[in-house]
Amino acid sequence: MAADRAQNLQDTFLNHVRKTKTPLTIFLVNGVKLQGIVTWFDNFCLLLRRDGHSQLVYKHAISTIMPGAPIQLFEGGEDSPA
């Protein structure tokens, strides 16, 4: 049944950067900048690792996530996700 359910963009993005260990820059709503790689995530938070230290970051505190390298989530051109 889980295979029939399409993954949302947020989960697809986070799963891709987790699997590829893509370095991220995360800006929080209060302006704080965090950097690291995602090692785990769920519906409410993600675990960010850098220099051997992990930080639990609540998703409601995140404003922007910028990958350190270009990523390709979907097959085809830039306007194919829909």
Curated annotation (Swiss-Prot):
It comes from the Bacteria. Keywords: RNA-binding, Stress response. One of its GO terms (cellular component) is cytosol. The keyword RNA-binding applies. Residues 11-71 form the Sm domain. GO terms for biological process: regulation of DNA-templated transcription; regulation of RNA stability; regulation of translation, ncRNA-mediated. Signal peptide: none annotated. GO terms for molecular function: RNA binding. RNA chaperone that binds small regulatory RNA (sRNAs) and mRNAs to facilitate mRNA translational regulation in response to envelope stress, environmental stress and changes in metabolite concentrations. Also binds with high specificity to tRNAs. Homohexamer. This is RNA-binding protein Hfq. It comes from Rhodopseudomonas palustris (strain HaA2). The gene is hfq.
